[in-house]
Amino acid sequence: MSQDAFSNHPITPEELPQASAQYFTPLSNTYIKVNLMCRLVFWLVVVSALLITYWQPWIALPKLMELYLPQIQLAAGGLGLLSSAYGILADKNKGYAIREHDFSYRSGVIFQSVVSQPILRIQHVELKHGPIDRHFGLSNLEIFSAGGAMHTFAIPGLPEEKAREIRSYVLTHSDIAAND
């Protein structure tokens, strides 16, 4: 590289791009519904196990446990409803953004975070889905940076076709940059 091609001009804060200019695409509504269903089923199992423990006739429960088990059941049910409501808010706040040179993922309700990865630094992209995701046609897209063992971030709940399109875009974009 010649010295003439290199430049390192200062940039003033006014010249920086506006962070609000980044548009985040929300995750699929199907993902939000499936996540809610999974949370509710989990808490239903927990509350049912507590109810069965309380009403079962085979083993005598200690008096203290018998006294507080109804309150524990109510607390577990309330906690289940609260965690499900929080999960809906958290899932609705998740989103991804694809720009010409980078890829970003936003998450969090109380503590929000945005993770950005330059496309040129992406080593590879993986599509993963478990049995529930597969049943509802959803995929998780995992973005791995060059030099890292773990994924930089994962975007859950993408429709299968959209996840394939994004993966293809990132891989072809990386190939074009490698040939420059």
What are these regions (language model features)?
Residues 1-120, 124-180:
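N-terminal basic, Ser/Thr-rich segments that initiate or prime the first beta/alpha elements at protein or domain
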